[in-house]
Regions:
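Conserved N-terminal phosphate-binding loop of PLP-dependent enzymes in the Aspartate aminotransferase
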Residues: 2-465
Length: 465
């Protein structure tokens, strides 16, 4: 079956819940950030904890509190959150229903290994209710990368094969199998396992092949995959692994015909299609599964991030034809499926349904697309803009013909927007944005105003106008 089952519409238009901070006062920057308390606290932490991310090194602010779409740092500055942590807090920070569910579970039962608990049963049945198609097997984990590893084991068990095809610039985690699916930098590249192969995927802004009319030619990519299967593998490919939308790479969207054609490509060759939906699932792209946007279902998928709204809970899900293979791999982990994690996930799913957040994410998407539509014409450094649900990307370039990435501009825009009170995620020359699904439109307008001001100021500084 190649079609996603239609899902019932979420009830009503989204209305902000009353618990959230008064966003009319956000942003508020009484102390130029990073302020003295943030700098002092981060310096102490950095002496002990090594390997902070690039975004922290660029702007070492210390966050002390979050509510809804607002964050407050140790110096009392308040920010609009356009990061959702790292694509995690889909319901905003500290949603009371989720917080209360976790607290109640912590008072009742914190860990029962992999025994069934009432709240675990509720989560498993709820997943079967909301997911499209014929998903019939689930395992619960505590991080995206462990769920990905479980999915790789499942694909091996289901097919008896051990090779995998993945794509340049996808991201799947930092354990050995997950790292082998991607190439992030030279350190990780040295640890890749044999039998893992990466291929280019269609990028409408940077196509490798085009039709005479200038549109991207998806068939050329599929021809390359077919040739690589014959010439570059031993013929033992278990699965094709893909992020439906590339998150780490900068919210890069596939052309509309790619996922359906990749589904057909896998079906014809007896290869499992494994979609890593840790980032894109649970409403982030406006659907329970991002693949639904293209009326396509994977055979195996992973869920995480927004599944627990910040609490570490992830899942591997498998469609009925491959469900028996899940019995061959152990579901036992120290923390996967613990009562607190399951409570967070159940509460998060219920809030998405009750507050109509799938529908609201698509309303936000429509606003963001309208707002950014003229940016490539309006700004010299803006090469491309894209959005699906609450996943946004703005690509900055030095030259619109060569499309040379403009990393320096990306850094400047990131810092300038943060200084104005917008918390978000850098990615070199690509501006990544992932606001919570609960964000009111008027707050989204404020956030986009800040970003546009930062882009315009950066252009002036770099003498690009």
């Amino acid at each position: 079956v190649n079609e996603a089952s239609p899902r019932p519409a979420c009830p009503g238009r989204y209305e902000p819940a009353p618990y959230r901070l008064d966003l009319s006062t956000c942003p508020s920057i009484p102390v130029p950030p990073p302020g003295p308390r943030s700098r002092e606290m981060h310096a102490r932490a950095e002496r002990i904890m090594r390997g902070y991310s690039g975004q922290v090194r660029l702007f070492p602010v210390v966050f002390a509190e979050g509510k809804g779409c607002a964050l407050q740092d140790a110096d009392g500055n308040r920010y609009i959150d356009f990061s959702s942590g790292i694509y995690v807090t889909n319901l905003g920070h500290c949603h009371p229903k989720v917080s209360e569910a976790v607290a109640d579970a912590a008072r009742t039962l914190m860990n029962a290994h992999d025994f069934t608990t009432p709240i675990k049963l509720r989560l498993l049945e709820l997943l079967m209710e909301i997911l499209p198609g014929d998903f019939a097997g689930v395992q619960l984990y505590d991080s995206g990368t462990t769920a990905v590893e479980a999915a790789l084991r499942t694909c091996r068990a289901a097919t008896g094969k051990g090779e995998f095809l993945s794509f340049f610039r996808d991201f799947h985690g930092k354990t050995l199998g997950a790292v082998s699916l991607a190439r992030m930098n030279s350190v990780y590249a040295q640890t890749r396992m044999p039998g893992f192969y990466m291929l280019p995927r269609p990028d409408t802004y940077r196509p490798l092949w085009q039709r005479p009319d200038g549109s991207l030619d998806t068939e050329k990519y599929l021809d390359l995959y077919d040739e690589f299967l014959r010439e570059g593998t031993s013929g033992q490919v278990a699965a094709v692994v893909i992020e439906p939308i590339q998150g780490w790479a900068g919210s890069i969207m596939p052309p509309d015909d790619f996922l359906p054609k990749l589904r057909t490509f896998c079906d014809k060759r007896g290869i499992i299609l494994f979609a890593d939906e840790v980032l894109t699932g649970m409403g982030r792209a406006g659907h329970w599964l991002c693949c639904e946007r293209w009326n396509t279902l994977p055979d195996v998928a992973t869920l995480g991030k927004g599944l627990g709204n910040g609490f570490p809970v992830t899942a591997m899900i498998v469609r009925k034809p491959y469900a028996d293979a899940v019995d061959k791999i152990s579901a036992s982990t120290s923390y996967g499926g613990n009562p607190m994690a399951c409570a967070a996930a159940v509460a998060s799913i219920e809030v998405i349904i009750e507050e109509g957040l799938l529908e609201h994410a698509r309303e936000l998407e429509a606003y963001f697309l309208r707002r950014m539509a003229d940016w490539p014409k309006k700004y010299v450094i803006v090469g491309d803009v894209r959005c699906m649900g609450c996943l946004l990307g703005v690509e900055l370039v030095k030259d619109k013909v060569t499309k040379e990435p403009f990393d320096e501009a990306g850094k400047r825009v990131y810092v300038k927007a943060f200084e104005r009170g917008l918390a978000w995620i850098p990615a070199g020359h690509i501006l990544r944005m992932s606001p919570p699904l609960v964000m009111p439109i008027e707050v989204a307008v404020k956030g986009m105003d800040i970003i546009e001001e930062a882009i315009a100021e950066t252009e002036r500084e770099l003498a690009m106008i």
